[in-house]
Every structure is written in structure tokens, then in C-alpha cells.
């Protein structure tokens, strides 16, 4: 089920290249550690293979359908505990923390120079103990609703979304990662709990640490937070829908009060096979080679004020 499991060979090669230690706990959680002598800080990231495109799955035989923006909304809610906001706990230790959601993953991270064990407990504890109520969800719906409206005022963000809506006719990628005000209004506590049961299982997650820390220290943190032992797993089945449809639109236009026109070009490629790192890197390079700042196309577009 896990994308991370499918990428184990790539992880092993990458880990060896950077001198990274790795282990898989009996619970299924993958722990990566890059001990860096001479460094005074520690960076940690706790990630799950759950992003905005994961909208349909079955949990213990029951189908679950999620509205757009669920993964991003859940990211916000995971940072809230009955005892308060996790970022306030980080502030007391002097750590810098953040979280983000992409199309295929959600990540929680911190960097710190002191109280590393305490910060690891905050990180693993908040993600491992979800807490949702109707009242807290309603409050967050208002907050994220304002965030969505703020991004609607960003020309670059709207341009990116317009490109995706041209590329995809009926695929979750065409929807904004944050969803819409209307879509997140559909969320309930049970929907979010279903997501944590399905995607926040240790076997679908990775803890990666680097800096002034050892692998044993990271594993001990997992033990303290109940992430070491094997546990009964929910039966989960999910798949990202295939997209074999032609382009939804060849072009799109919108108007906004901007100082200069915004212009974007997108090319629809075949889906990447999980673990095909070589092709992924080649596609990343292709953008620079075709429309990068040193290309003739870029200069021609620049000269025509595009």
C-alpha cells in the first residue's frame, strides 16, 4: 500500500550515498538518521504518504470519499492537541517548526539546538494522537477559508491552478491542495479520524533526522511514543486514479490587477513509476533546458513582454 515501501530500493541507495543509517521498526515505521559530527543543531521531519490526490479509499471494507482539501486541513488539525497548539510547545523549547501538504505527502518538521528529545516527543506525540471535535473543525474551517481567499489574490497561484485545470479533466490534481471554502465545509471529525487510521499508520510513515543526533536516540523517541511495537493494522486499499483523458483545455485566460502579464506553459507527461528517480530527474532538467532563463524561447518570450 505504501509509496514509501515501494521506494525502499531508492531510499537505500540514497542513504548509502549520504552516509545515512536506516532501520524499519516492528511497527513498520521507517527511521532514517544522518549523524553529522560538528553540527550543533538537529533537523527532523515526520512524513506520511497522504496528500491532496488521495481522495478515495476503503477502510476495513468501507468506501471513504473525501472532499478536496482534506489532507491540508488534516495537517492543520494534527498540530492541535487537547493541551494546546503544538507550535506553542515548540516555542517553549526554542525550536523552529513547520508543516506542509503537497499532492502526495504531508510533512511535519522542526529544527532545534537544544531539548532534542523533548522536541521529538512533541513531533511524534502530536501526529500520533489525533484530536478532533465539531467545534475545533468549525473554527479551522473559518481560518483555512480565509487562507484560501488569500491565495485567490495571488496571480502566480491562480496561474498554476489554471495550468492544472487545463491539463486534467477529471483528476484530483486539478483541485487546489487547500480545496475550496465549499469543499472543506463538508469535513467532519469522523472523516478526519478515518484518514488518520488509513494513512497515519507507522507503516505508511517515515521519520528522518539529521545533525547532532544518533539513530538510537531517534528509535528511543519512537519507543517513548508507542511507535516501536507491531500493532493491529486497519485494512486499507487505495489507488491514485489513472488519467488517460486528453487535455481538458488547450489554454485558459483570467484577468487580475497586476503590474505585468503572467504567462505559463505546461506539458502533460506520462505518469512516473514510483522509484523511477532517473526519469524524475530528467523531467526536472527538461524544464530548464526548454524554457529556462538561458534558452532562446525564454528570451523570445521575454522580448515580447510575456
Predicted feature descriptions by range:
Residues 3, 82-195, 216, 243:
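Acidic/histidine-enriched segments that form metal/cofactor-coordinating
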Residues 303-306:
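Short, intrinsically disordered, charge-balanced linker/junction segments flanking boundaries
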Residues 1-86, 193-300:
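His/Glu-rich zincin catalytic helix
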Amino acid at each position: 500500500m505504501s509509496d514509501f515501501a515501494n521506494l525502499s530500493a531508492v531510499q537505500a541507495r540514497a542513504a548509502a550515498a549520504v552516509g545515512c543509517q536506516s532501520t524499519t521498526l516492528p511497527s513498520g515505521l521507517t527511521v532514517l538518521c544522518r549523524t553529522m559530527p560538528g553540527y550543533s543543531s538537529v533537523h527532523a521531519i515526520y512524513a506520511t504518504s497522504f496528500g491532496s490526490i488521495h481522495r478515495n479509499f476503503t477502510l476495513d471494507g468501507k468506501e471513504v470519499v473525501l472532499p478536496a482539501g482534506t489532507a491540508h486541513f488534516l495537517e492543520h488539525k494534527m498540530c492541535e492537541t487537547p493541551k494546546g497548539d503544538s507550535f506553542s510547545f515548540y516555542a517553549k523549547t526554542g525550536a523552529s517548526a513547520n508543516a506542509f501538504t503537497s499532492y502526495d505527502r504531508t510533512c511535519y518538521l522542526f529544527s532545534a539546538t537544544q531539548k532534542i528529545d523533548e522536541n521529538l516527543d512533541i513531533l511524534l506525540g502530536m501526529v500520533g494522537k489525533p484530536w478532533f471535535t465539531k467545534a475545533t473543525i468549525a473554527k479551522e474551517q473559518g481560518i483555512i477559508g480565509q487562507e484560501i481567499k488569500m491565495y485567490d489574490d495571488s496571480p502566480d497561484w491562480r496561474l498554476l491552478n489554471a495550468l492544472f485545470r487545463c491539463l486534467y479533466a477529471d483528476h484530483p490534481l486539478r483541485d487546489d491542495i487547500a480545496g475550496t471554502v465549499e469543499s472543506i465545509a463538508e469535513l467532519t471529525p469522523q472523516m478526519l479520524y478515518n484518514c488518520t487510521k488509513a494513512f497515519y499508520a507507522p507503516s505508511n510513515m517515515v521519520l528522518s533526522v539529521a545533525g547532532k543526533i544518533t539513530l538510537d536516540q531517534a528509535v528511543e523517541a519512537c519507543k517513548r511514543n508507542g511507535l516501536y511495537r507491531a500493532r493491529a493494522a486497519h485494512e486499507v486499499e487505495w489507488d491514485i486514479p489513472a488519467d488517460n483523458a486528453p487535455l481538458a483545455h488547450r489554454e485558459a485566460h483570467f484577468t487580475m490587477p497586476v503590474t505585468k502579464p503572467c504567462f505559463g506553459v505546461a506539458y502533460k507527461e506520462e505518469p512516473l513509476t514510483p522509484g523511477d528517480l532517473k526519469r524524475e530527474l530528467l523531467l526536472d532538467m527538461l524544464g530548464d533546458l526548454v524554457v529556462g532563463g538561458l534558452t532562446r524561447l525564454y528570451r523570445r518570450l521575454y522580448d515580447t513582454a510575456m
